Design a protein with these regions (language model features):
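Positively charged n-region of N-terminal signal peptides that target proteins for export
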Residues: 1-4
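C-terminal motif of bacterial Sec signal peptides marking the signal peptidase cleavage site
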Residues: 15-18
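Sec-dependent N-terminal signal peptides
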Residues: 6-11
């Protein structure tokens, strides 16, 4: 009986530790944000670029697992136009699209994204919604998209 309980416990532990592999890392937690940063650092056409906007996505409403990232950057190969390009974890790089950028934004590198600050801001947003009586209907919602920008 002890052996069965031990095996069941080990199986349950495996399932719990594998959940992030099955469902993905939460977008509003450090692992999800670091996963997005890794894509932007290593995958083409993002590697080495400066970004004006970085959007993290879950993919569907009511999900909170990180599924993809969209970045807006200036593309020297495309006459210096602003390009928006998405990368989804299922391995699909979307076609680039022309985009526009506000004059109030300044470009930034991936290493400038403060993961701890993004996680803290997301936690503060949840707490604000939890504690605000007028917004109580939004309590227990999931963040579907997050945009990271740098103001001038």
């Amino acid at each position: 009986m002890k052996k069965i309980t031990l095996l069941l416990g080990m199986a349950l532990t495996f399932v719990l530790t594998s959940c992030s592999l099955i469902f993905g890392n939460k977008m509003t937690e450090k692992d999800g944000i670091n996963e997005a940063k890794e894509i932007l650092e290593k995958e083409q056409p993002f590697a080495g670029k400066e970004f004006y906007k970085v959007r993290l996505h879950t993919g569907k409403p009511l999900e909170d697992a990180f599924k993809g990232v969209t970045a807006v950057f200036k593309d020297p190969e495309n006459e210096g136009k602003y390009i928006s390009q998405a990368y989804w974890k299922i391995g699909k790089l979307q076609n680039p699209q022309e985009d526009s950028v506000s004059d109030n934004l300044t470009p930034f590198k991936v290493e400038e994204i403060d993961t701890d600050m993004v996680v803290k801001d997301a936690a503060e947003l949840y707490k604000f919604l939890e504690n605000n009586e007028e917004l109580k209907d939004f309590n227990r919602f999931n963040v579907r998209d997050m945009t990271i920008i740098k103001w001038k």
